[in-house]
């Protein structure tokens, strides 16, 4: 496993970031400047709250491709904590949300850095065989 860019801290949390490969893929992140980008366009209140209130710099996340061949592709690190997502208030952006008032975005985003691509994808079917992952929301019906 590759080294993480900052020392582990005792309160590190682990997250799952899902993206459709046609919208934003692992390769898009890997090819971004410094392998870093913002995780924008999230329009789910629970996910927004996690990004805004709980994701901390140094936390790690699994990068999950949804779609035809779903699975965990790589590991990312949160490098900037939650802040307002300006795509929500830009009418020209595909993530525009007319419910956001004026320049005030009700949505949040974090910045992430690609740490490591896994040697092979970890599939949903494989995750379902692991008893220690039984309570993982991703594995529950209706959570994908």
Predicted regions and their residues:
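Short alpha-helix capping/helix-loop boundary micro-motifs
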Residues: 40-51
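Short beta-strand-centered aromatic/proline hotspots
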Residues: 60, 71-83
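Short beta-strand or tight-loop elements
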Residues: 57-59, 108
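Contiguous surface segments at macromolecular interaction interfaces
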Residues: 1-29, 36-37, 44, 85-144
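Short polar/acidic secondary-structure junctions
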Residues: 66-68
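Short, well-ordered loop/turn sites that connect or cap secondary structure elements
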Residues: 52-56
């Amino acid at each position: 496993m590759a080294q993480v860019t900052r020392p582990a801290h005792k309160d590190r949390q682990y997250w799952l970031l899902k993206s459709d490969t046609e919208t934003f893929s692992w390769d898009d992140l890997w090819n971004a400047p410094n392998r870093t980008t913002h995780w924008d366009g999230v329009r789910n209140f629970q996910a927004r709250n996690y990004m805004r209130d709980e994701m901390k710099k140094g936390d790690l996340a699994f990068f999950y491709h949804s779609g035809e061949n779903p699975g965990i592709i790589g590991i990312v690190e949160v490098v900037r904590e939650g802040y307002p997502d300006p795509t929500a208030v830009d009418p020209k952006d595909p993530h525009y949300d007319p419910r956001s008032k004026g320049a005030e975005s009700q949505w949040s985003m974090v910045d992430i850095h690609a740490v490591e691509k896994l040697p092979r994808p970890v599939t949903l079917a494989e995750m379902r065989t692991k008893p220690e992952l039984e309570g993982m929301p991703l594995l529950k019906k209706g959570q994908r």
